[in-house]
Amino acid sequence: MIEANQLHDLVVKPALLSLGKQFSQRAARTLIMGTIAHESMSGRFIKQVGGPALGIIQMEPVTHDDIWENYLRYKPELVNRLKLLFEINDPNVDRLIYDLRYNAVMCRLHYRRVKEKLPAADDIQGMARYWKTHYNTANGKGSTEQFIQHFNHYIAGAL
């Protein structure tokens, strides 16, 4: 498990700030921290048994590739920034296995595609619903109750 203050201060916040202030508001950082808390037990897993998802955000390869192919392809300035930040020419889903900041950025970009406004940073129930609707989806195994439980266990008090 990655200690929550360190995860936030050394990974999530600087990763999002490197994209620009419009990506790094407190609500976005809280949602990403909650996503990590639930999806990987705050960094305990980078790949779980029985599924394709990778990294501390447990993103499936098809989702990773879709962000690059159907979102970022229309945002060349952002693509250039990502290529400079991560010193990459071609995105590779395997980067989720070893690059914590890449995890934070990809998670933020996944949520950034959503038209619905982020819940307030202190609205954990709203964050749980947002995560379930836009990240885990109706077909996912996770529940809002589990999200809240994991948030309270791993993250609460650190942000």
Locate each region found by the language model.
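Inter-helical turn/loop segments and adjacent helix faces that build the functional surface
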Residues: 114-122
